[in-house]
Amino acid sequence: MKKKVVVGMSGGVDSSVAAYLLKEQGYDVIGVTMQIWQDDATEAAENGCCGISAVDDARRVAGQLDIPYYVMNFKNEFKCNVIDYFVDEYKKGRTPNPCIACNRYVKWESLLKRSLEIGADYIATGHYARIHQLPNGRYTICNSVTARKDQTYALYNLTQEQLSHTLLPIGDYTKDQVREIASKIGITVAKKPDSMEICFIPDNDYAGFITRETGYTSVPGNFIDVNGNVIGRHQGIIHYTVGQRKGLGLALGKPAFVVAIRPETNEVVIGDNSDVFSPKLYANNLNFMSIPSLESEMRAKGKIRYSHEGAMCTIRMFDENTLECTFDEPVRAVTPGQALVLYDGDNVLGGGTII
């Protein structure tokens, strides 16, 4: 009997080709688009990765591939695990990564649960990453063949159970190869551009979204320098992130950067570019992937944001729930709320949330 796989289809070329490749490999493929946006009438719903146009594109591709297609409602799961988390983190002066939360709790936890209930063996997506089972029996995410599109950073906190039921068919392909496959088989979305912004904030106005979503009003406070001197007034901490230079509204006669955000005093610390570099960081909410736990100090490569190339570091457990990461060379803009993702060669070792 054929193995059944549910493919999360966003209406883009990557998930469309993923569905095609799995069908070619002999799987019984079902296409599913996750309906996550709260208001179908919004512009975001029309253009987002799981909105109205995504449903239309995905349904059209499923028809071309001759596979069953469904839309599943995950609005509540998305609201609780992604939007509410995003808003709460910004209000605490942190900079969250909603895509990581969406992957763990919506695209995998919720979609996998629903898929297993309808008799599927696996779920699959169009992420540029690969899954390997190691000699120790554990599953890990590995870098895709194309570093430019590698998406392992956003998948570091998947569980072993989730990985054992996951297929990532385009991890062995480059983006150009994926588009070439789509063109060759006549998929209508072959030339569709990649989505770049957060799907529920297409205008990138995070502060505006938080205000519209919750009615929260930013409370102005003081800009202070690294010595604690007041040097100006800010618009509210939700407008800033560590490392930020633009939009500060400060005339100091030299470049100024956000060094830290202090929600307890409603202060934003400003300094020179050199002040933004840190030799170490701490992380919690840990998830280990290629190893069950960190028993002793070890070397790794650490990435502190999606676009970070990664830097060599030494890691150890600081306490039962906190990891200490010391970099060989200071890294720029260590940002609370973002993920630290650790690599052992091409394999994801694990990661956590920067504190």
Residue ranges and their predicted role:
Residues 1-156, 167, 176-177:
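ATP-dependent adenylation/nucleotidyltransferase module used to activate substrates
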Residues 124-133, 140-355:
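AMP-forming adenylation/ATP pyrophosphatase catalytic core
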